[in-house]
Amino acid sequence: EGDPVHREIAKALGANLYIPRLFGHGLEEAEPMLNFDNDSYWESAKEALEVAKQLGDRVILLGTSHGGALSLSLSSDPNIAALCLYGPNIAVFDPLSKLLSKPWGLQIARFAKGGNYHEMRGASDEKKNYWTAKIRLESLTHMQKFLDLTMKKSTFKKIEIPVFIGYYYKNDSLQDKVVSVPAMLKMFDQLGTPNALKFKKAFPNAGDHVITSYLSTEHYDEVTEETLRFLRKVLKG
C-alpha cells in the first residue's frame, strides 16, 4: 500500500526501511480476518516499533489508512521523530459505520451487505495480489471500536512531534470516500504540535484513497516530494 513512496523516502533520507506485517494482515485464509482483534493488532504494532528502534537513532512512522490511526496512537514513544500520515482513518467516510461497534452492529452490517463479508470493489487482479479484497465483517467491528477508543481530542492534543498529513480531495464529489477528510482536518487542528511543525496537503489528482501506491494512483511522486520537503524542513540535523 505504501510502495513506492516509502522506499523512495527511505532512499532519499539514507534511512532504513522496516515494513512490518501487522496481526491479521497478509494471510491466505478461508475466512479472511475472522480472527482479527484489537489487542493482538496493538501488540504487533508495539513489537514492530521496537524492531524499528533497533535499526536507527530515530523513527519516522509512515502510516496509511487504518495504519494512520495506529501511528497516532503510538506517537507517545520518545524515539518517534515524526509522523507522516496518508489518508489516515480518523473516521470512516460513511457515518453509519459508527454503528459497527454498537450493540447489534454486526447484525446490521450483515443485513446491509447481504452476507458475512466486505469486498473491495473494482480491484484489479494485480491489486488483489497485495490487498485482502474480501474480509469478514467481524474485523470491521474491531476496527471501528479502535477508532472509538483512540481517535479523539485527548489523543491528538498530546502529540507534539512533527506531523504531515496527505489526502485525496478535489471537491465534494471527487474526494476520499473510504475515510473522512473532514475528520482528518479536525484532528489536524486538535494536534498539540506547533503550527510550524505540522503540515496538511490535499492531492486533488490522486483519484484514490490510497495515495502512496503505484497500483492506485499515477501521482504518487507528488506525495513523495511533499513528504520529503516537510521532513527535511522539520528534522534538520
Range-by-range predicted roles:
Residues 62-67, 71:
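Gly/Ala-rich beta-loop-alpha elbow adjacent to hydrolase catalytic centers
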Residues 27-55:
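Catalytic nucleophile-loop/oxyanion-hole region of alpha/beta-hydrolase
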